[in-house]
Structures are given as structure tokens and as C-alpha cells.
Design a protein with these regions (language model features):
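Transmembrane alpha-helices and adjacent helix-loop boundaries
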Residues: 1-196
Length: 196
């Protein structure tokens, strides 16, 4: 039972990372998608670079950069601002900005798959831009991107174990610690069953 309570505490951290990442990265991804599709070429370029960097570098590296960069670039110890929770906050920031880039590309592909005739028909019917998006584009977009977003959500579940990179103790890290201390693999199997 001690093992299960320790794994339960780790599971709560994993669930927190998962839920907060989804809560913020899904809408942020939509904003990044709009920025990527903006008519302003400078804005479009900035978001294209952001997406390329986030999708082209490993999440583990991004977590390390988010955690250590403020101190090494600005000499600011953010740990003193946030206390012991800065590790978790750094993990959340890293996950959110990483997954927002992936969701932005998923949304962009979904938006580009909607025929131009849909927009033209909405304009002829007197819909404004927001009404067109809300009543015509968004329902189609949701249906088109749902399978890909679901795949990304499954990847996020597995990626929560990368929080150990900056010493955030989530479920898989707890399982490794228990297995190392007791020289028994049961904790890893239980964690694996809970994870996957």
C-alpha cells in the first residue's frame, strides 16, 4: 500500500502536467495558427520560426532551456520567485509552448483542408468573419483535426515522464526510485499499467 500511495502522488503530478498542458496549449495553438496564417509577413515569419524550433528540437532540451535559461541569460533566479514550485512551472511552460506548436500545425492543416467555396458561400450569405469561423469553419475543423489531436494527446500522456529532466517527480520517476530502492520491478509494472 505504501508503494501505491507513492505512485498515486506521482500520478497526481503526471495528471497535473497533462491537464494544464492541454488546457493552455489547445487554445494557444489556435492563436499560433492564426499568427502563422496572418497576412503580415513579419508576423507569419516569427510564428513559422517558433513552430520550426519547437517541432525541430527535443522536448527534453526545451525543458532544460526553460528551466536554466532565465538564470544564465538574465541572472534571475526564478526559484526564489516561485519557491520550490519553479521546477513544475518550468515543466508546464515547456510542455505548453511545445504542444502549442504541434497543435498549431494540426489546426493549420485542418483550416487549409476546408474548401475556399465554404468561405465564399458564407460571405454571400452575409456572414462576417467571426460568424463564418464560428458557424461554418469551426465545426468542420473540429471534425477534421480530432483524430490527429487525439494522437497528440496520447503522446502527451507518455511525454509527462520527461518531467524528470528538471527533477519534477512524477509517477514514472517514483516507480524507478521504488524499484531501485527495493530491487523489485513491481513498481515499474504497476506504473506502466497505470500510464498506458
Amino acid at each position: 500500500t505504501n508503494m501505491l500511495s507513492m505512485l498515486g502522488n506521482g500520478m497526481l503530478t503526471s495528471l497535473l502536467i497533462f491537464c494544464v498542458t492541454l488546457l493552455f496549449s489547445l487554445p494557444l495553438g489556435l492563436l499560433v495558427c492564426f499568427g502563422r496564417r496572418a497576412k503580415n509577413p513579419i508576423l507569419q515569419w516569427i510564428f513559422r520560426i517558433y513552430i520550426s524550433v519547437m517541432r525541430g528540437t527535443p522536448l527534453m532540451l526545451q525543458l532544460v532551456v526553460v528551466y536554466f535559461a532565465p538564470y544564465y541569460l538574465f541572472g534571475v533566479s526564478l526559484g526564489s520567485l516561485f519557491g520550490g514550485n519553479y521546477r513544475l512551472i518550468a515543466v508546464l511552460i515547456g510542455f505548453i509552448i511545445n504542444y502549442a506548436a504541434y497543435f498549431a500545425e494540426i489546426y493549420r492543416a485542418g483550416l487549409e483542408s476546408i474548401p475556399v467555396g465554404q468561405y465564399e458561400a458564407a460571405k454571400v450569405l452575409g456572414y462576417g468573419r467571426m460568424a463564418t469561423f464560428q458557424h461554418i469553419v469551426l465545426p468542420q475543423l473540429t471534425r477534421r483535426v480530432l483524430p490527429t489531436v487525439t494522437n497528440e494527446v496520447i503522446t502527451l500522456i507518455k511525454d509527462t515522464s520527461l518531467a524528470y529532466t528538471v527533477s519534477v517527480v512524477e509517477m514514472f520517476t517514483v516507480a524507478k526510485q521504488i524499484s531501485a530502492a527495493e530491487t523489485d520491478m513491481t513498481a515499474l509494472f504497476v506504473a506502466g499499467a497505470m500510464y498506458y
